[in-house]
Design a protein with these regions (language model features):
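Fe(II)/2-oxoglutarate oxygenase catalytic core
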Residues: 1-152, 158
Length: 158
């Protein structure tokens, strides 16, 4: 059942109005996102991040839960037991040389070491910025994920 490509793409996971609302609604809450295994590592990650939960965004959270359940059922078949982390919004600003270097999404904390699946949704319109490619390297083949606004990209966290 596990896909040979080791990723799944869902176009139109969020509409443009929802993407805009998330960007503007959380822009004032951004903090430095350069932590890697609890330490600042700007050579690996330079970004601004914030988090939101189901209370703050019930409709978006429900959509994410439904997407994860559907993709997992039809593509990955992981044994998922919970959503142990809030959703993260990240901003990689060109004037700050924003980036996130190659990494896996499994971390050292109790929660991060249990991660099985990562979901990225492109909130920005790709015509509004340069760069910003999400590259995956499943099975040793680099793949540029689609940058279409509202598109969800799923991949194993490990």
């Amino acid at each position: 059942m596990f896909p040979e490509e080791m990723y799944a793409i869902v176009p139109d996971a969020l509409d443009a109005a929802t993407c805009d609302r998330l960007i503007t609604g959380f822009a004032h809450e951004m903090d430095d996102g350069g932590l890697v295994q609890g330490q600042t590592a700007a050579h690996i990650r330079r970004s601004k991040i914030t988090w939101f939960n189901e209370e703050q965004e019930p409709v978006v959270s429900r959509r994410i839960i439904d997407l994860v359940a559907d993709v997992n059922r039809n593509v990955f078949d992981f044994m998922l037991t919970d959503f142990a982390e809030d959703a993260q919004i990240a901003c990689y600003s060109g004037d700050q040389r924003g980036h996130y270097d190659w990494h896996s999404d499994v971390g050292a904390s109790d929660v991060a070491r249990r991660r099985k699946m990562t979901l990225v949704i492109q909130l920005s319109d790709p015509d509004e910025y340069e760069g910003g490619s999400l590259q995956l390297n499943p099975a040793g083949h680099v793949f540029d994920a689609p940058m279409t606004r509202g598109t969800a990209i799923f991949f194993p966290s490990f």
